[in-house]
Amino acid sequence: MNILLFGKTGQVGWELQRALAPLGNLIALDVHSTDYCGDFSNPEGVAETVKKIRPDVIVNAAAHTDVDKAESEPEFAQLLNATSVEAIAKAANEVGAWVIHYSTDYVFPGTGEIPWQGGTDATAPLNVYGETKLSSEKKALQKHCGKHIIFRTSWVYAGKGNNFAKTMLRLAKEREELAVINDQFGRPTGAELLADCTAHAIRVAVDKPEVAGLYHLVAGGTTTWHDYAALVFEEARKAGINLALNKLNAVPTTAYPTPARRPHNSRLNTEKFQQNFALVLPDWQVGVKRMLNELFTTTAI
């Protein structure tokens, strides 16, 4: 099997390089690649890459993911998140390739308390990022490439690079008091979990093309940013890390205004994914604790 990966150096892309390698011949690209174009600001270039390589599977982990910055550069966000995805979808259809693509809970309005159902619940993005990702689903893949799998996910983290836990730990060493948002609900999902589930889904799809479609892929359970931070601090103290923090306050979203609106409810219903791919998605704490353990034992916090 020949697999083409876009966005190899991002949080998810890095884990995908590991998870996809056993499936066959992997060609992994990013914006700086020179042998083939992996630059999503060049739709014609990435489409030409697909036509030259003629892969069996394309995995797209490239995106404009700066949610707040997207508000001030909507055209650029649309170019990276939708226009180039459409170009890839058309080229993939020409060569008969599967396309695996990642989307977001931000396609929903973020209201209520019930996990969003894929395919039945109405979409209504709150921000530019959500609009561009919804466009990548509907106007690109669903329109131009039948052999696609779209994974909507949320609250993605990885041990590589910056993440929420590292930021909280840094602040907790510097300050005695912190205030963290407690009215946004979601499921922290590790890039490692996304990559492993993607590799499994590809193996299933190759043998059962009827699994093509839209899925929600997040870890189990539910938390808030405040409770997520509380877990991070609890695990840090268990590991013997000294924190200056002695008070953690819960505050509403309005306490931290941002250019892009954030949803109150980022919960996603994953029943369809678990049924079609015969997998169980572990509770969010499992992955976060694993990431923290690796962080505590391999680096100085």
UniProtKB/Swiss-Prot annotation:
GO terms for cellular component: cytosol. The keyword Isomerase does not apply. NADPH binds at Q11, V12, D39, F40, A63, H64, T65, Y102, Y129, K133. It holds the Pfam family RmlD_sub_bind. Pathway: Carbohydrate biosynthesis; dTDP-L-rhamnose biosynthesis; Bacterial outer membrane biogenesis; LPS O-antigen biosynthesis. NADH binds at G10, Q11, V12, D30, D39, F40, A63, H64, T65, Y129, K133. GO terms for biological process: dTDP-rhamnose biosynthetic process; lipopolysaccharide biosynthetic process; O antigen biosynthetic process; polysaccharide biosynthetic process. DTDP-beta-L-rhamnose binds at T104, D105, W155. The record marks T104 as: Could provide a fine-tuning to achieve optimal pKa matching between active site and substrate. Homodimer. This is dTDP-4-dehydrorhamnose reductase.
